[in-house]
Amino acid sequence: MEFDKEVDASGLNCPLPILRCKKGLSDMSAAQVLKVIATDPGSVKDFNAFCVQTGHELLQLDQDETSFTFYIKKRAD
């Protein structure tokens, strides 16, 4: 999937991946896509809740043995 910016939150536990995501989205334009890589198993639930609460769209979640990759589309302001 194409993306505009990447944030690597590997090795960080809650709430740091979400905080890195919020910071990454802060200087992006509406409809741009942020790729976030995380290793915390709780991040799946956290990112789903974050997107519901903020109005950003979780476009895709990829998972392998060691990490989760989230593609988040920034909402229109």
Where in this protein do the model-derived segments appear?
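An N-terminal amphipathic alpha-helical segment
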Residues: 1-28
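Intrinsic-disorder/low-complexity, polar/charged segments enriched in Ser/Thr/Lys/Arg/Asp/Glu/Gln
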Residues: 4-6, 31-35, 67-69
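Solvent-exposed beta-strand sheet faces enriched in polar/charged residues
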Residues: 8, 37, 61-62
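Generic beta-structure capping elements
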Residues: 10, 39, 73-75
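Helix-centric, low-specificity signal for extended rod-like, repetitive segments
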Residues: 13-15, 38, 68
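C-terminal structural segments of small proteins and small subunits
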Residues: 48-77
